[in-house]
Amino acid sequence: MARSKSSNRWLEEHVNDPFVKQAQQDGYRSRASYKLLEINNKDRLIKPTDLVVDLGSAPGGWSQVAAKLVGHKGRVVASDILPMDPIAGVEFIQGDFTEQEVFDQIMAILDGARADVVISDMAPNISGVNAADQAASMYLVELALDMACQVLKPKGSFVAKVFHGEGYDEYVKTVRESFDKVVIRKPDSSRARSREVYLVAKGFRVA
């Protein structure tokens, strides 16, 4: 079966992508690791001893970065519907965190502790229908925000991938209602033609 032009373009980009090559050299599971590293270098979100919750963590690129940043005295709790190979210093729960059973497992691992940072690089499976894909991506990021508001400690931080499109402006407005400072980042490691940006929210205000 012949590849489509778009899949050929993706393959060519992937093969020639310097961040893909760098990830292989550095032992990261995906190029996405550099997005979190860039964001953290600018915004100083994750610090040694922090407790980080990683939503939609597979294959583990962000969890790897978070584990290095928090060090052996910190904790990373990760969750994804998909399986994820073990990472030293990361406690992983497979399942949908919106389901009560999985949510309860996460809360049990946290054991009353509140997260310093919640991170989410979640994205839906792309159908190619822009309206449907945008709706699906906004749904995921709304779920991530809801989860963050349930587990963050006061003054905690939240980072999530968001796609420009319908619902974007309203979402940013909603996040501002719960955090002292909200900025939008477009890391160098994010492909220029991608509509993705990263919302960085600091200073969580507990309702």
Swiss-Prot record:
Its main location: cytoplasm. It is an enzyme of class 2 (transferase). It is found in: Cytoplasm. Its EC number is 2.1.1.166. One of its GO terms (molecular function) is rRNA (uridine-2'-O-)-methyltransferase activity. Keywords: Cytoplasm, Methyltransferase, rRNA processing, S-adenosyl-L-methionine, Transferase. It catalyses: uridine(2552) in 23S rRNA + S-adenosyl-L-methionine = 2'-O-methyluridine(2552) in 23S rRNA + S-adenosyl-L-homocysteine + H(+). One of its GO terms (cellular component) is cytoplasm. InterPro entries: RNA_methyltr_RlmE, RNA_MeTrfase_FtsJ_dom, rRNA-MeTfrase_E, SAM-dependent_MTases_sf. The active site is at K161 (proton acceptor). S-adenosyl-L-methionine binds at G60, W62, D80, D96, D121. It holds the Pfam family FtsJ. Specifically methylates the uridine in position 2552 of 23S rRNA at the 2'-O position of the ribose in the fully assembled 50S ribosomal subunit. Belongs to the class I-like SAM-binding methyltransferase superfamily. RNA methyltransferase RlmE family. This is Ribosomal RNA large subunit methyltransferase E. It comes from Marinobacter nauticus (strain ATCC 700491 / DSM 11845 / VT8).
